[in-house]
Amino acid sequence: MIKIGIIGGAGYTANELIKILINHPKVEIKTIVSTTYPGIPIEYIHKDLIGEIKSNKLFSSEITDDIDLLFLCIGHGHSKKILKNISYKINVIDFSNDFRINKNFFFKKRIFNYGLPELNKNIINKYNNIANPGCFATAIQLSILPLAKIKLLKNNIHISAITGSTGAGRINNSKLNFSFRNNNISTYNLFNHNHINEVIQTINKLQNKYDGKIYFIPYRGGFSRGIISTLYTRIDLSFEEIKNIYDKFYKNDPFIFLSEKEIHLKQVINTNKCILNLKYIKNKLIITSIIDNLIKGASGQAVQNMNIMYNFEETCGLKLKPLGL
């Protein structure tokens, strides 16, 4: 059994991570740290865990050394400070953006690898430290990986994507609370969202270079969870050729599905799936992708990375069912 520690245990991604791991046959959760709620029963904060964990299980104030793997479910910019006090013998999967870009892969004696399984599955188990991708970055990259792999991305890419309120985490912000987001939609970080750095890095890795530009408009949605992304770019191939490229690329990826029908968020909420819909209009390839931002965009993908890291079945603990209605 792999012994697990979690830091940032009171947040939304930690909640989903705990729910996945308590049903994972290969792991044991040893410590869940929350600096905000030390000594408080975990089910007091994560009320959906009542009956799922022992009622006397408390948040800890610090991590213990008797673990094999540490999940860092904390905000951006804090991971390095925490890792200074963590033994190098403990493997790490980090949810923040601190180690996602090449220039940040090295920290002290740790070397991080970018944990997008559909991109780096063959090398993830060679690393002890994984930078979990951003949620928008995941939805967007899964839309274009097959094209970048054979160097087909040559033109500008235009993206619009909308995310649920849980994407911002448990923070006190007037633009993120219920009264603002309910029955509402708003843009933010137009053409300047930091997840695009991950996308550009991946395109350059696969194609060596990319001369086009990426125009990304992110939206805050009036719902709690999920991401739906639609992008388009010019591709000078037939639609049949494009579909064959996607089918071939994703044939061994258990969480990626292509749908000829229109797709919607309820198909993926509570799952580690990404569903893609392709359309081709006047040399423009239009790709819609849907994921659960808390699972495939965060905690589920982290467990998928863990499974690959430890040579478990990739889907272990992740055979989750969508909410549906």
Swiss-Prot record:
Coiled-coil blocks: none
According to its UniProt record, which residues of this chain constitute the active site?
135
Identify this protein by name: N-acetyl-gamma-glutamyl-phosphate reductase
Which EC numbers does the record give? 1.2.1.38
Record's HAMAP family? ArgC_type1
What is the top-level taxon of the source organism?
Answer: Bacteria
Pfam families annotated for this entry?
Semialdhyde_dh, Semialdhyde_dhC_1
Q: In which pathway does it act?
A: Amino-acid biosynthesis; L-arginine biosynthesis; N(2)-acetyl-L-ornithine from L-glutamate: step 3/4
Q: Name one GO molecular function term.
A: NADP+ binding
Which major enzyme category is it?
A: oxidoreductase
Keyword terms:
Amino-acid biosynthesis, Arginine biosynthesis, Cytoplasm, NADP, Oxidoreductase
SMART domains per UniProt: Semialdhyde_dh (SM00859)
Which biological process annotations from GO are given for this protein? L-arginine biosynthetic process
**Family classification:** Belongs to the NAGSA dehydrogenase family. Type 1 subfamily.
Q: Which Gene Ontology terms of cellular component type are present?
A: cytoplasm
The entry's localization annotation reads:
Cytoplasm
- Fetch the NCBIfam families from UniProt: argC
Instruction: Give me the reactions it catalyses.
Output: N-acetyl-L-glutamate 5-semialdehyde + phosphate + NADP(+) = N-acetyl-L-glutamyl 5-phosphate + NADPH + H(+)
Q: What job does this protein perform?
A: Catalyzes the NADPH-dependent reduction of N-acetyl-5-glutamyl phosphate to yield N-acetyl-L-glutamate 5-semialdehyde.
